[in-house]
């Protein structure tokens, strides 16, 4: 009988990769907002709202990627930071 919680490794890697790619789009939005604000420092409230929104979603996607990597034992949330470089490195380790 097939285990109902069996994880398809390739599908999981694809999902993690998608989560990391999406997180980077939010990081690019943050970087763009910073550059725009430095050039036009007149709308501080819009700047902070945009940063807050994008940062929250950035963290959501990074946390989901971390949770998936934790499922296969490739990430230790207690001792590692769920940031892009760490998660990307773990994904590369799993892919090889």
Q: Which ranges hold each PLM region?
A:
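Intrinsically disordered, low-complexity regions enriched in serine, threonine, proline
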Residues: 6, 14, 49, 86-87
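Acidic, low-complexity, intrinsically disordered interaction modules
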Residues: 35-85
């Amino acid at each position: 009988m097939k285990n109902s919680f069996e994880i398809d490794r390739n599908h999981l890697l694809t999902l993690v990769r998608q989560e990391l790619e999406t997180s980077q789009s939010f990081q690019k939005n943050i970087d763009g907002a910073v550059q725009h604000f430095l050039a036009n420092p007149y709308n501080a409230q819009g700047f902070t709202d945009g940063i807050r929104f994008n940062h929250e979603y950035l963290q959501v996607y990074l946390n989901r990627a971390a949770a998936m990597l934790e499922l296969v034992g490739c990430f230790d949330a207690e001792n590692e930071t769920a940031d892009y470089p760490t998660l990307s490195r773990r994904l590369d380790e799993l892919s090889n």
